[in-house]
Every structure is written in C-alpha cells, then in structure tokens.
Amino acid sequence: DCLGWMAGCDFNDNKCCAGYVCKKHPWCRYDL
C-alpha cells in the first residue's frame, strides 16, 4: 500500500505512491 497526495510520509519517499516525493517535507507531493 502506498500513500497518495498530502498523506503523511515522514520524509520517506518510499512510502509515497509513484509520482510523489517526500524528501524535503512530511507529506507526499507531486514530483514536479
């Protein structure tokens, strides 16, 4: 199971769904 838009991911990209990043913030966001 992966986390989608604005889900809490604790700075761990691996928790986010494909296309989302979490490196510099605590939420999954679009990888622009």
Curated annotation (Swiss-Prot):
Pfam families named among the record's database cross-references: Toxin_12
Alphabetic keyword roster: Disulfide bond, Ion channel impairing toxin, Knottin, Neurotoxin, Secreted, Toxin, Voltage-gated sodium channel impairing toxin
This protein's record includes keyword Mitochondrion: no
Tissue specificity of this protein: Expressed by the venom gland.
Record-annotated disulphide pairs: C2-C17, C9-C22, C16-C28
Domain of life: Eukaryota
Entry-linked InterPro entries: Huwentoxin-1
Main location per the UniProt record: secreted
GO terms for MF: ion channel inhibitor activity; sodium channel regulator activity; toxin activity
A cellular-component GO term for this protein: extracellular region
Subcellular location: Secreted
Similarity annotation: Belongs to the neurotoxin 10 (Hwtx-1) family.
Known role: Voltage-gated sodium channel Nav1.7/SCN9A inhibitor.
Protein name: Mu-theraphotoxin-Se1a
Organism: Selenocosmia effera (Tarantula spider)
Organism placement in taxonomy: Eukaryota, Metazoa, Ecdysozoa, Arthropoda, Chelicerata
